[in-house]
Amino acid sequence: AGVGGALGGQYLSGQGPVLVLNGDLISSVDVTALVVQHEATGAKATLSLWEVEDPSRFGVCDLDESGMIGRFQEKPEPGTEFSNLINAGCYLIERDVLSNLSSDKHSMEREVFPGLAEAGGMSGLAFTGYFVDAGTPDSFIEAAQVCIANGRYDSGRVEGDSWFGEDSN
């Protein structure tokens, strides 16, 4: 159904903003800092942002000095990007934005984020540390290496640059 369809308001209960994490990434984003930024700006959505050399695989954000995102463009053609700051796949979004979405297929990045940014309702928080989008075979291996290097596993053992599950030989 796309991320937007899966987040459609009919599936949500509770109060306050919704934390969304893309399932194919590893990062060191500080969610508490993201919440503080979201509350301080009063934004409808607050995105974690990461700087990359080639942003063509990602959504690109134009962040101003007050922490607001003025433009959002999903997967720009190489050479057309206006920034190297990308959506790092962890964001807070207000429930009223989601309540307007149906369960049909929606792309948050193509249908929701650009309008929120243009309307002045989107903030961003750039972070440092590590970020790996594990959407390709090579980046999946890189993500595993980042997890090993940063102790991001809760079972098994590490030998050299390899991780082994609890019952593996």
Model feature map: region roles:
Residues 63-81:
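Short, flexible, basic/aromatic active-site loop/helix in glycosyltransferases
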Residues 13, 55-56, 64, 83-85, ...:
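A generic fold-level signal
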Residues 33, 40-41, 66-68, 95-169:
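Left-handed beta-helix
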Residues 88-93:
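Short glycine- and hydrophobic/aromatic-rich loop-to-beta-strand nucleating segment
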